[in-house]
Swiss-Prot record:
This is Ubiquitin carboxyl-terminal hydrolase CYLD. The modification Phosphoserine is found at residues 383, 414, 418. The active site is at residues 597, 867. Deubiquitinase that specifically cleaves 'Lys-63'- and linear 'Met-1'-linked polyubiquitin chains and is involved in NF-kappa-B activation and TNF-alpha-induced necroptosis. Negatively regulates NF-kappa-B activation by deubiquitinating upstream signaling factors. Contributes to the regulation of cell survival, proliferation and differentiation via its effects on NF-kappa-B activation. Negative regulator of Wnt signaling. Inhibits HDAC6 and thereby promotes acetylation of alpha-tubulin and stabilization of microtubules. It comes from Mus musculus (Mouse). Zn(2+) 2 binds at residues 795, 798, 821, 829. Residues 327-346 have a biased composition (Polar residues). Coiled coil: none annotated. GO terms for molecular function: cysteine-type deubiquitinase activity; K48-linked deubiquitinase activity; K63-linked deubiquitinase activity; proline-rich region binding; protein kinase binding; zinc ion binding. Phosphorylated on several serine residues by IKKA and/or IKKB in response to immune stimuli. Phosphorylation requires IKBKG. Phosphorylation abolishes TRAF2 deubiquitination, interferes with the activation of Jun kinases, and strongly reduces CD40-dependent gene activation by NF-kappa-B. Ubiquitinated. Polyubiquitinated in hepatocytes treated with palmitic acid. Ubiquitination is mediated by E3 ligase TRIM47 and leads to proteasomal degradation. Interacts (via CAP-Gly domain) with IKBKG/NEMO (via proline-rich C-terminal region). Interacts with TRAF2 and TRIP. Interacts with PLK1, DVL1, DVL3, MAVS, TBK1, IKKE and RIGI. Interacts (via CAP-Gly domain) with microtubules. Interacts with HDAC6 and BCL3. Interacts with MAP3K7. Identified in a complex with TRAF6 and SQSTM1. Interacts with OPTN and SQSTM1. Interacts with CEP350. Interacts with RNF31; the interaction is indirect and is mediated via SPATA2.
């Protein structure tokens, strides 16, 4: 096979890429123009379709004796651009491309591609699927469970899908990972009990235990398959009513899961008849099917042309998107039995009626009433159709079926369109009203030849200022909503059209093609083509002007019905049942938008059910405060904290106001758009803007007091400790660094020991519900660890001694200190006097009244895969926990809105009652509900003093 290699340079301006992919069926020999070396591109390589900007399409115009070629960028050699003959490639859809690209051996990749049933079943393999894994060739397969599905490195236009499998039974210990890939934890399992493999090494275990084994085919199996009875691009006919219609075969094969029914044929009709989109049962069988003119029928309903006819220029028609090239399917084709017969047999197949609704005759117009959008001259938005004279012969269509079962925001998801033709009273074929995406702009289809490449788009918008990228609406009942992806004027039409990508699938729509020409690319059944003058700005939003970016969209569009209140009155947090009723549900908490989860979750933790920092909201402005101090404080108090406590909801618009203020700080940037760390946010807000008196005052080894707003635990991992508590971690850190609190804090924010967002020092951390900081305070009376009397000395070297209150800070009275350090192992210990308050009442400690300084846990901030969520305690009961996610759900697509949600998670209380030993032995994957995230993903734990929270 020969092909032209244009260069080994990076593909930039000369081409633009589309998300269409092809598999090479023949080996390529190409020359690198830089090195003049011959490069081999093996069969089984995958290329991405590219288009030449200068000519508007990727095919090299055919000359006499030469066939069409298409341009490809080989994914394995991303700088190589080459042209290949159409016959030497086959198109595959993106989902199959992802599965195949993970297989590095091109021969094995091609073999799996030809085994299309196995490949189709690969789409069913997901997290939780039971599988068998072939680790080494010729050896037995090991059972396992899929724990991860996705790309390992997302660095290409499309990335290969790998499967992370936890090996079970005899496979345990035979793997090579614990779920970590290049330092990133993709799933969790025991050491050497996990593997990352591609689909060719997997076998899905199904209910009947057959799995994919019967479908597995090696390269040698594929040559024994019967070829289909009809060749691609061959001409055929079929009876439609009383007339005969002709077309070209673009698909001929058995249907996945329906092999016993025999062959089915996809025909691209010469006239606009049919409504097959190339899919069957969710599997794309043919990528060149057009809902405007393609039909799928059983082979019994097809009549091959017996006489030579002049054909249309052949389309790029292959067994594509999961279907192999002719004769290369690896499962057995059906024999000529009762289920199949010679093409042209006139016994209508049962599945013909199943796939196409009914027979294509006059009865169809009775059983399948089409619906179309009528033209209303008074409202230009209604003028979506221009009926040809043929339409006058058809009786008016009835009203569309009732759609009351759909919610108002979902009614436009699907419409009962029909794309067939009905016989006219005079015997000719008259158009029935077609879908909005076809008939509203079709005109006389036969007067215009098939357009191979899109015309240049028209850059200017309409009178409403609509342009490419605008949120638009096509006013109908119900209306269509979407984003304009293309504006232009196709050949043969006098009107300027707009190509919209709809929010949801709609029957009769395409994937970006119109009349056989691709104008943009989107998901199937989401591309709608209408006259530009019929479009209006999306009426669901307050602003009619398009916005330039996500930052301004948050404000100018007002987020529809997602605005929140402004509350001037100072409001303490509502606790227990009252707080629960206010806060739980969807559209509760703080709405996330554009990488704001770090800020949403931190604010929710600090203020939803705690008043520990309320003084921050009340301090009057002083002369040294910055100019926007009052603006920030007022925003926090009246638009965020108070509404959150009264109504349980704050919209993203208010948070964006705060993010813009954070951007004003000279040392800060990216707060309106980038992902940030909570500690960075707290430092900017508390230190630079609000000038909050530092929450913590810490002294190191008698040195000057250091001020800070939160404390991060730094320590080396102790392999002897399975699940540490926050109490242990804080004490270890203070002892090892020789630190003390100079004052008892009213609010203590502790950052967990971890490096960055990904690496955790401990797999689980137990969030102590109560924190005793008495032994960590300066000038505070403390109990002797032995007798309970007033401690006079502290010994850091005794801390690790397992014989004396293991894992506790050691302080002793004078007598006990002498006794303890008489032991030979402790003779050389260096202990120091405990600092005590000068005015300590003598009778207090003599009567055992040494007070304890304790703090209560009120919130935990967690992170998993760069997304922050929050756990908050709303009452005294152990089960009084709520889980908050600012981006729990979504309304709409790319230009939609996040929906925050707060849910009760009482199961947390049960896990916090468990012993540390039981918690350590518990498999993290078996932890129910949200509790796993609390125990495994803690980022910050927040404590408050029950007696001081309103005074500091």
């Amino acid at each position: 096979m020969s092909s032209g290699l244009w260069s080994q340079e990076k593909v930039t301006s000369p081409y633009w890429e589309e998300r269409i992919f092809y598999l090479l069926l023949q080996e390529c020999s190409v020359t690198d123009k830089q090195t003049q070396k011959l490069l081999k591109v093996p069969k089984g390589s995958i290329g991405q379709y590219i288009q030449d900007r200068s000519v508007g399409h990727s095919r090299v115009p055919s000359t006499k004796g030469k066939k069409n070629q298409i341009g490809l960028k080989i994914l394995e050699q991303p700088h190589a651009v080459l042209f290949v003959d159409e016959k030497d490639v086959v198109e595959i859809n993106e989902k199959f491309t992802e599965l195949l690209l993970a297989i590095t051996n091109c021969e094995e990749r091609l073999s799996l591609f030809r085994n299309r049933l196995r490949l189709s079943k690969g789409l069913q393999v997901d997290v939780g699927s039971p599988v068998k894994v072939q680790l080494r060739s010729g050896e037995e397969k090991f059972p396992g469970v899929v724990r991860f599905r996705g790309p390992l490195l997302a660095e290409r236009t499309v990335s290969g899908i790998f499967f992370g499998v936890e090996l079970l039974e005899e496979g345990r210990g035979q793997g090579f990972t614990d779920g970590v890939y290049q330092g990133k934890q993709l799933f969790q399992c025991d050491e050497d009990c996990g593997v990352f493999v591609a689909l060719d090494k997997l076998e899905l275990i199904e209910d009947d235990d057959n799995g994919l084994e019967s479908d597995f085919a090696g390269p040698g199996d594929t040559m024994q398959v019967e070829p289909p009875p009809l060749e691609i691009n061959s001409r055929v006919s079929l009876k439609v009513g009383e007339s005969t219609e002709s077309g070209t075969v673009i698909f001929c094969d058995v249907l996945p899961g329906k092999e016993s029914l025999g062959y089915f044929v996809g025909v691209d009709m010469d006239n606009p008849i049919g409504n097959w989109d190339g899919r069957f049962d969710g599997v794309q069988l043919c990528s060149f099917a057009s809902v405007e003119s393609t039909i799928l029928l059983h082979i019994n309903d097809i009549i091959p042309d017996s006489v030579t006819q002049e054909r249309r220029p052949p389309k790029l028609a292959f067994m594509s998107r999961g279907v192999g090239d002719k004769g290369s399917s690896s499962h057995n084709k059906p024999k000529v039995t009762g289920s199949t017969s010679d093409p042209g047999s006139r016994n209508r197949s049962e599945l013909f009626y199943t796939l196409n609704g009914s027979s294509v005759d006059s009865q169809q117009s009775k059983s399948k009433n089409p619906w179309y959008i009528d033209e209303v001259a008074e409202d230009p938005a209604k003028s979506l159709t221009e009926m040809s004279s043929d339409f006058g012969h058809s009786s008016p269509p009835p009203q569309p079926p009732s759609m009351n079962s759909l919610s108002s925001e979902n009614r436009f998801h699907s419409l009962p369109f029909s794309l067939t033709k009905m016989p006219n009273t005079n015997g000719s074929m008259a158009h029935s009203p077609l879908s909005l995406s076809v008939q509203s702009v079709m005109g006389e289809l036969n007067s215009t030849p098939v357009q191979e490449s899109p015309p240049l788009p028209i850059s200017s918008g309409n009178a409403h200022g609509l342009e490419v990228g605008s949120l638009a609406e096509v006013k109908e009942n119900p209306p269509f909503y979407g984003v304009i992806r293309w504006i232009g004027q196709p050949p043969g039409l006098s009107d300027v059209l707009a190509g919209l990508e709809l929010e949801d699938e709609c029957a009769g729509c395409t994937d970006g093609t119109f009349r056989g020409t691709r104008y943009f690319t989107c998901a199937l059944k989401k591309a709608l083509f209408v006259k530009l003058k019929s479009c209006r700005p999306d009426s669901r939003f307050a602003s009619l002007q398009p916005v330039s970016n996500q930052i301004e969209r948050c404000n100018s569009l007002a987020f529809g019905g997602y605005l929140s209140e402004v509350v001037e009155e100072n409001t303490p947090p509502k606790m227990e049942k009252e707080g629960l009723e206010i806060m739980i549900g969807k559209k509760k908490g703080i709405q996330g938008h554009y990488n704001s989860c770090y800020l949403d979750s931190t604010l929710f933790c600090l203020f939803a059910f705690s008043s520990a920092l309320d003084t921050v909201l009340l301090r009057p402005k002083e002369k040294n405060d910055i100019e926007y101090y009052s603006e920030t404080q007022e925003l926090l108090r009246t638009e965020i904290v108070n509404p959150l406590r009264i109504y349980g909801y704050v919209c993203a618009t208010k948070i964006m106001k705060l993010r813009k203020i954070l951007e004003k700080v000279e040392a800060a940037s990216g707060f309106t758009s980038e992902e940030k760390d909570p500690e960075e946010f707290l430092n900017i807000l508390f230190h630079d803007i609000l000038r909050v008196e530092p929450l913590l005052k810490i002294r190191s080894a008698g040195q000057k007091v250091q001020d800070c707003n939160f404390y991060q635990i730094f320590m080396e991992k102790n392999e002897k400790v399975g699940v540490p508590t926050i109490q242990q971690l804080l004490e270890w850190s203070f002892i090892n660094s020789n630190l003390k609190f100079a004052e008892a804090p009213s609010c203590l924010i502790i950052q967990m020991p971890r490096f960055g967002k990904d690496f955790k020092l401990f797999k689980k951390i137990f969030p102590s519900l109560e924190l005793n900081i008495t032994d960590l305070l300066e000038d505070t009376p403390r109990q002797c660890r032995i007798c309970g009397g007033l401690a006079m000395y502290e010994c850091r070297e005794c801390y690790d001694d397992p014989d004396i209150s293991a894992g506790k800070i050691k302080q002793f009275c004078k007598t006990c200190s002498t006794q303890v350090h008489l032991h030979p192992r402790r003779l050389n210990h260096s202990y120091h006097p405990v600092s005590l308050p000068k005015d300590l009442p003598d009778w207090d400690w003599r009567h055992g009244c040494i007070p304890c300084q304790k703090m209560e846990l009120f919130a935990v901030l967690c992170i998993e895969t760069s997304h922050y969520v929050a756990f908050v305690k709303y009452g005294k009961d152990d089960s009084a926990w709520l889980f908050f996610d600012s981006m729990a759900d979504r309304d709409g697509g790319q230009n939609g809105f996040n929906i925050p949600q707060v849910t009760p998670c009482p199961e947390v209380g049960e896990y916090l009652k468990m012993s540390l030993e039981d918690l350590h032995s518990l498999d993290s994957r078996r932890i129910q509900g949200c509790a796993r995230r609390l125990l495994c993903d803690a980022y910050m734990c927040m404590y408050q003093s029950p007696t001081m929270s309103l005074y500091k």
